[in-house]
């Protein structure tokens, strides 16, 4: 009989030596992002990257409510205003120039969306937290001026979240899919026939094929083409003009890329992830007219700062509603 010291023994080596090992996607085309801009030496929950028609980048800090504006050429960072609503999570820009800010509220029932100028003036409630129970994390405009939004409620065994469509007059809210666990990122295909949604705490990617009315799901059109692995899960996403989908993986320090059918075709790693740094990667977004992708991440858990990183994607970014 073997003594204990002679028994086969597991050792930390190779992938098992990483704080966030990549297993199922290890054979994908993989690149590592380069640092682009430090937003703060403090760990801030950066989110909501979006460019206006002048090419200025807007983003926010979820927990403190700061709205940032970055000049990509000079790298100058301004803070035009602070959200008056708790826990803003996304910024989308209307083609009239207004910022639409999604906010999570108390993470239970007091989320909503407000619109404001780039300086935070002329605030208008689009979806009021007093009259709904949504916890709104993200949204995407269609070409008609309506938008889809994600309801961030629930958890893995209590799927309260969903996806809804708001008509261009902002008066009618129509459910698209419901009973999902923390609906998070959302993107619309270039032809507006496919809606992508990430379900964070269930680690799933939804592909929803829509009829021409934009709210009816095609027969057998709601599918789950991909199941993610690891902690915590998929976050915000965006598309390029080839209809590839870029999904930030929160808690993993990387972005996964899928083709238009939902097959993984590449990944982007944030530097330091194997050592447990900058794991809170939340949102990818393209610089308008280019294939240059910006990714935000922070190092709150390790006491580090908040950064924007950059790579080149497969194709130029899709020119969404604000540029039409």
From Swiss-Prot:
It comes from the Bacteria. One of its GO terms (molecular function) is hydrolase activity. GO terms for cellular component: cytoplasm. SUPFAM superfamilies: Calcium-dependent phosphotriesterase (SSF63829). Binds 2 Ca(2+) ions per subunit. Its EC number is 3.1.1.-. Ca(2+) 2 binds at residues 109, 111, 129, 132, 134. Its main location: cytoplasm. Ca(2+) 1 binds at residues 47, 137, 184, 235-236. Its cofactor is Ca(2+). It is an enzyme of class 3 (hydrolase). The active site is at 235 (proton donor). It is found in: Cytoplasm. Keywords: Calcium, Cytoplasm, Hydrolase, Metal-binding. Exhibits lactonase activity. Acts in cells with perturbed membrane integrity and is possibly related to the membrane homeostasis. Belongs to the SMP-30/CGR1 family. This is Lactonase drp35. The gene is drp35.
